[in-house]
Amino acid sequence: MSLNIETTQGLERRVAITVPTEIVSKAIHEEFKRAAKNVRVDGFRKGHVPAHIIEQRFGASIRQDVLNDLLPRHFFDAVIAEKINIAGRPTFAIETFEEGKDLVFTATFEVYPEVKLQGLENIKVEKPTVEITEADIDKMIDVLRKQQATWAESQDIAKADDRVTIDFVGSVDGEEFEGGKATDFVLFMGQGRMIPGFEEGIVGHKAGEQFDIDVTFPAEYHAENLKGKAAKFAITLKKVENMVLPELTDEFVAKFGPNTKSVADLRAEIRKNMERELKNALVSRVKQQVINGLIEQNPIDVPASVVEEEINVLRNQAAQRFGGNTQQAAQLPRELFEAEATRRVQVGLLFSEVIKSNELKADKERAKAMIADIASAYEQPAEVVEYYSKNKELMNNIRNVVLEEQAVDAVLAKAQVTEKVSSFDEIMNPQA
């Protein structure tokens, strides 16, 4: 077998492969022998069908079967011998496939780029340091109390955190627009669900009042005909309700678990949960900075075929989130996912090189600690640990996550790392 490799463009390669006629003839002969033993033809006993009948009835399909075997087998033999790191699937083009002649074909495929890490010392990472305060716990308790709140009708003016019931009719240039009208609409004030200025226009009014609100739709509003338009809403305020928070009693805290018997227990449980969430958020924030730095310092081309596979993964995930199926996923525009898919492939290749160059292997103790941390969020942590230990797929996922964390640590050891004192809210609600 002879081999000729050429670079077509970027990461695309074309390999011309010649398979000697004796190998082709032997493969065809062996396939005909197998067929002669197994084919059934009316009027002949199994294994006694004449050769010319087999040729006439099955010759074309037998040769196609031989071809389907020879092409990938000799292609992969060739790329393994040449140590080519193939990405995706090859496409084959037959040049010659005739009795008594060499099989000549070409395979077009992509290769993974050669990654040589550089510039790790130029990567800048800001590592937040956070201490959870009693005030942070107080805020979390307030959230829990609001989740259990009741509502009491009020004759006072509407304010933030109230619940109001309204009728409204919206118009632009004196004309009502689609979707701008509602009756008995319940609005939780202060949550920012409506366009800017809408809730603020209700504040200060009482139940029974009718009034107008002037607002402007945001330039990025989803309805094309309303983007940036000035609008007027005629409001009828039908009801104002004040939020009534439950008292922080032992009876209240008992709702949050069998082991929560006092306010002190609740605060301890909240702190534990906040610490776990904070730890995950900090790991994620540092990891994203490392990823951004790696990509910036190591721009690499990625195989289009692998990006396409990742696009399909993202498509299917998006469809599943909204209850769709595979057919619906295929209809989603690839442009929605291309940038994220490309980034994922880049990250995978760069992390693989970090792991390879540092000879990293998943730390068993670190994996155990990660499983224990996950299990601590459940009522029966021992059962969760056992479940993980018996599930190969879950264990592989844990090892991969641990390996990625070790890769991040390896980059951090060479990067420019600075610490910044931050609050719990700054880390957990960065957009607030």
UniProtKB/Swiss-Prot annotation:
Coiled coil: none
Signal peptide boundaries: none
Keywords: Cell cycle, Cell division, Chaperone, Cytoplasm, Isomerase, Rotamase
EC number(s) stated in the UniProt entry for this protein: 5.2.1.8
EC primary class: isomerase
Catalytic activity: [protein]-peptidylproline (omega=180) = [protein]-peptidylproline (omega=0)
Residue ranges of domain PPIase FKBP-type in the record: 161-246
Main location: cytoplasm
GO BP term (any one): protein transport
Gene Ontology cellular component terms for the protein in this record: cytoplasm
Residue pairs linked by disulfide bridges in the UniProt entry: none
Compartments reported by the entry: Cytoplasm
Pfam families for this protein: FKBP_C (PF00254), Trigger_C (PF05698), Trigger_N (PF05697)
A Gene Ontology molecular function term of the record: protein folding chaperone
HAMAP family noted in UniProt: Trigger_factor_Tig
Domain notes: Consists of 3 domains; the N-terminus binds the ribosome, the middle domain has PPIase activity, while the C-terminus has intrinsic chaperone activity on its own.
Annotated PANTHER family: TRIGGER FACTOR CHAPERONE AND PEPTIDYL-PROLYL CIS/TRANS ISOMERASE, TRIGGER FACTOR-LIKE PROTEIN TIG, CHLOROPLASTIC
Role this protein plays: Involved in protein export. Acts as a chaperone by maintaining the newly synthesized protein in an open conformation. Functions as a peptidyl-prolyl cis-trans isomerase.
Family statement: Belongs to the FKBP-type PPIase family. Tig subfamily.
Protein name, entry field: Trigger factor
Taxonomic placement: Bacteria, Pseudomonadati, Pseudomonadota, Gammaproteobacteria, Pasteurellales
Gene name for this UniProt entry: tig
